[in-house]
């Protein structure tokens, strides 16, 4: 899937953004995050000097260092010395010493999305937005374009497994990018094609707690398209459907709905593989096999198909790409089948942290492995989200057979009374369907699992915090309870 660019191709790419030739060194504050690291990697491959800082090393910073970036651990004013521009993520506080120093030195400070917008400015940009499904849809579209020989640049919010990275510099005019609505920074982007997968109440602090403001922001995002641009929108989502009359751009809709322009029919699932047919006006029906489970992933794939079809990608390339798709990191990530006593347990890790995301993950697990007992380790993400969606979480989580509840991963937030894992556990228990177990520390998990796991269980680790590290620890130890206790 990947090829290395030669010097001539790199020189051609550098001419795409002529004014960026004035820039020598680009410094990223918070470079270890998925969104920041992707842009840093593309710019590094374009030949720019890249530096960055983060609190601690991780696999991402190790990879960037190997590719030539200079990484500092800890934030210090001197880290920005010599930088032409400083790029910041929304997680960085305004009193961060590197931001303070950059302002004092009159070094331009830009947000992540502004730098992504510069990468997109002279390319054919395809931006994927929505509350859920952005990362997988971006990865699917990337796979299709590679299979068609179009060699796109891509910047994704998660690992594209077939590429082994979340970002890559291509030599064509196409740039496929995940567009982040969490801080409304996707309004900086000016793509040629925009996808909206769905719209739900999330990151509401950004929008003053007003859902109408969030909806208007998505409308504004779509109106950043040129008049000849294309909006691809999921008509199954009630909020997206509501907004359709307010969009003054060409629209193609997709979904299971009868009135979708690009429509899914005859969906079925066997274990990890979904199979369905996509109907398109004036085009042959596409009989699709997709190696990731769930109707939500059929929707993600159909969004990618709608864009690819509109841009003339060959049907055979589309079908091959979807069949060969390996998935994205931490999205129903099958980590293995592990022997435990008299049988085996299937381990799956998933990033979903909104009630709707957790719900579709549960449904995918039930559809593909209906005879397995579903055991979930759930880690709530952010106190504010837990508070705002408390009853929705309680309703969704009671659908599993066994629930192990961790405490909230704060993501830097101050604790909110009553919006914690123990309280949520108590509420779910009071609803009477299941008897969840609150696990106060990660170190307590092995002994709890030793008493819980049974032959042929499906163990699902769920959440956007460090529960993913727990999943990989469990996989590394092959669910050996004794070994986990020793750890």
From Swiss-Prot:
It catalyses: UDP-N-acetyl-alpha-D-muramate + L-alanine + ATP = UDP-N-acetyl-alpha-D-muramoyl-L-alanine + ADP + phosphate + H(+). Pathway: Cell wall biogenesis; peptidoglycan biosynthesis. One of its GO terms (cellular component) is cytoplasm. InterPro entries: Mur-like_cat_sf, Mur_ligase_C, Mur_ligase_C_dom_sf, Mur_ligase_cen, Mur_ligase_N, MurCDEF_pg_biosynth, UDP-N-AcMur_Ala_ligase_MurC. It comes from the Bacteria. The keyword Zinc does not apply. SUPFAM superfamilies: MurCD N-terminal domain, MurD-like peptide ligases, catalytic domain, MurD-like peptide ligases, peptide-binding domain. One of its GO terms (molecular function) is ATP binding. GO terms for biological process: cell division; cell wall organization; peptidoglycan biosynthetic process; regulation of cell shape. It is an enzyme of class 6 (ligase). The keyword Cell division applies. Coiled coil: none annotated. Signal peptide: none annotated. Its EC number is 6.3.2.8. Pfam families: Mur_ligase, Mur_ligase_C, Mur_ligase_M. ATP binds at residues 130-136. Keywords: ATP-binding, Cell cycle, Cell division, Cell shape, Cell wall biogenesis/degradation, Cytoplasm, Ligase, Nucleotide-binding, Peptidoglycan synthesis. It is found in: Cytoplasm. Cell wall formation. Belongs to the MurCDEF family. This is UDP-N-acetylmuramate--L-alanine ligase. It comes from Photobacterium profundum (strain SS9).
């Amino acid at each position: 899937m990947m090829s290395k660019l030669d010097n001539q191709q790199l020189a051609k790419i550098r001419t795409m953004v002529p004014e960026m030739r004035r820039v020598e060194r680009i410094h990223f504050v918070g470079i270890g995050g998925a969104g920041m690291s992707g842009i840093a990697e593309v710019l590094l491959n374009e030949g720019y000097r890249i530096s960055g800082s983060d609190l601690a090393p991780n696999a991402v910073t190790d990879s960037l260092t190997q590719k030539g970036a200079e990484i500092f651990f800890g934030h210090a004013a001197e880290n920005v010395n010599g930088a032409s521009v400083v790029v910041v993520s929304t997680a960085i506080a305004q009193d961060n010493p590197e931001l303070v120093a950059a302002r004092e030195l009159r070094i331009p400070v830009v947000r992540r999305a502004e730098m992504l917008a510069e990468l997109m400015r002279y390319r054919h940009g395809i931006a994927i937005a929505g509350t859920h499904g952005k990362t997988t849809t971006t990865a699917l579209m990337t796979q299709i374009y590679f299979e068609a020989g179009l060699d796109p640049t891509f910047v994704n919010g998660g690992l594209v497994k077939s590429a082994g990275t979340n970002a890559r510099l291509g030599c064509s005019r196409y740039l496929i990018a995940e567009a982040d609505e969490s801080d409304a920074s996707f309004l900086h982007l000016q793509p040629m094609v925009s996808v909206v997968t769905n719209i739900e109440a999330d990151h509401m602090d950004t929008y003053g707690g007003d859902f109408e403001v969030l909806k208007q922001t998505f409308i504004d995002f779509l109106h950043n398209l040129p008049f000849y641009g294309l909006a691809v929108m999921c008509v199954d989502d009630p909020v997206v459907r509501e907004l359709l009359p307010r969009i003054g751009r060409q629209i193609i809709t997709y979904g299971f709905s009868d009135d979708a322009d690009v429509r899914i029919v005859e969906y079925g699932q066997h274990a990890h593989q979904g199979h369905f047919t996509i109907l398109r006006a004036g085009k042959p029906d596409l009989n699709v096999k997709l190696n990731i489970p769930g109707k939500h992933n059929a929707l993600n794939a159909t969004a990618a198909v709608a864009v690819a079809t509109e841009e003339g990608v060959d049907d055979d390339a589309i079908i091959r790409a979807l069949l060969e798709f390996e998935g994205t990191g931490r999205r129903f990530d099958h980590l293995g089948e592990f022997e435990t006593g008299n049988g085996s347990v299937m381990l799956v890790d998933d990033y979903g942290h909104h009630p709707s995301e957790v719900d579709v993950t549960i449904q995918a697990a039930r559809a593909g492995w209906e005879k397995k007992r579903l055991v979930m380790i759930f880690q709530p993400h952010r106190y504010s989200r837990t508070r705002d969606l408390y009853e929705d979480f309680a309703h969704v989580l009671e659908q599993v057979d066994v629930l192990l509840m961790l405490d909230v991963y704060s993501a830097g937030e101050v604790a909110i009374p009553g919006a914690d894992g123990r309280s949520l556990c108590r509420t779910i228990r009071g609803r009477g369907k299941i008897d969840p177990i609150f696990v106060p520390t990660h170190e307590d998990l092995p002994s709890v699992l030793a008493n819980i796991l049974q032959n042929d269980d499906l163990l699902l680790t769920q959440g956007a915090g460090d529960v993913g590290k727990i999943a990989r620890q469990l996989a590394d130890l092959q669910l050996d309870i004794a070994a986990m206790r020793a750890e």
